[in-house]
């Protein structure tokens, strides 16, 4: 073979490898990585050492509703942060899960607060984005309700973040929310609320609960007209690393609201899930009967069998592809209309 042909073949191979690398790297939002920074928080960067100080500065300095980007350098930030509705289109960029950590300890039992007030980070603003940040509540299982993050704004997107707590870790309170490649840790009702929330390619890790039951989701949907629910797609449900759940019954969800709606689809479910799958909210069996909607679609893994799932009302739903399509990013949260501008990668359909 002539030298020029060999060089040409080597060029093609190199180009193919580079293209593959670009495809693999495509899951990382490049524009987020290269976003223009308005503020930097952390040691050695500026005089701003706390996130609360950065938020206050942003409120004072920004003009209009143009996106405002705050870089939060690696470190543990022991503070409770509130992002009010007067700061829409805010982005917090961390240095990665387990590196940039926002940590709090407030709880219902330990601080005489409502669940709503315990959040380490509260997002009331629309258009919020976070990437590469751990949101943590260290109160522990015995402290009962202790929220790591509460989101009440619309069009919130989280990429490669971690949410760590026990009971009531992630409060998806209101609005359209999207979580991509995130880790959620908890023991009881640790994804809960009345938002339109989709979790895609996430790890959902169950921790040791205070009692003998562990429950992942608790939808607060109260009206059949509400287009709300908790959707888990292409994700992995497992015991938290190092956690032993012998003697513990683990359930996919229980109904906090009269018309609770949760859908688990195209996900891998480990053997920790009880064969019945779903649990009643104690004392509300007759109230919620035939109103709740729990569905599963094309899940895999030893905990995915629906043969012994509970059989009450709409709780036992093995849905068709046409039905599952209604719970995709495109259909359920109208993601095609707003997620592209966040630069967070997503799959719009099944």
How would you describe each model-predicted region?
Residues 2-350:
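Sequence-level preference for short, compositionally simple segments enriched
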């Amino acid at each position: 073979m002539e030298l020029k042909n060999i060089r040409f073949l080597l060029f093609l191979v190199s180009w193919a490898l580079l293209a593959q690398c670009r495809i693999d790297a495509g899951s990382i939002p490049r524009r987020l990585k290269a976003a223009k920074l308005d503020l930097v928080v952390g040691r050695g960067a500026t005089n701003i050492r706390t996130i609360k100080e950065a938020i206050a500065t942003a409120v004072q300095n920004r003009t209009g509703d143009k996106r405002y980007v705050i870089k939060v350098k690696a470190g543990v930030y022991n503070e409770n942060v509130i992002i009010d509705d007067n700061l829409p289109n805010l982005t917090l960029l961390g240095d990665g899960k387990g590196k940039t950590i926002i940590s709090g300890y407030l709880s219902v039992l330990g601080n005489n607060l409502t669940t709503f007030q315990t959040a380490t980070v509260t997002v009331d603003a629309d258009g919020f984005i976070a990437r590469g940040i751990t949101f943590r509540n260290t109160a522990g299982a015995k402290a009962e309700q202790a929220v790591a993050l509460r989101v009440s704004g619309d069009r919130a997107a989280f990429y490669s973040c971690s949410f760590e707590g026990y009971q009531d870790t992630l409060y998806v309170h209101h609005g359209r929310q999207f979580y991509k490649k995130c880790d959620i840790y908890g023991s009881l009702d640790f994804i809960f609320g009345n938002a339109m929330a989709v979790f895609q390619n996430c790890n959902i890790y169950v921790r040791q609960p205070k009692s003998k039951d562990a429950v992942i989701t608790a939808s607060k949907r109260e009206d059949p007209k509400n287009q709300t629910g908790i959707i888990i797609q292409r994700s992995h449900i497992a015991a938290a690393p190092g956690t032993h759940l012998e003697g513990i019954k683990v359930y996919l969800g229980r109904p906090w609201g009269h018309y609770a709606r949760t859908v688990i689809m195209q996900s891998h479910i480990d053997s920790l899930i009880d064969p019945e799958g779903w649990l009643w909210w104690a004392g509300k069996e007759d109230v919620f009967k035939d109103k709740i909607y729990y569905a599963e679609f094309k899940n895999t893994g030893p905990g995915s069998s629906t043969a012994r799932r509970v059989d009450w009302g709409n709780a036992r739903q093995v849905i068709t592809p046409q039905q599952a399509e209604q719970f995709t990013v495109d259909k359920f949260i109208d993601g095609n209309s707003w997620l592209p501008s966040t630069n967070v990668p997503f799959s719009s359909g099944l």
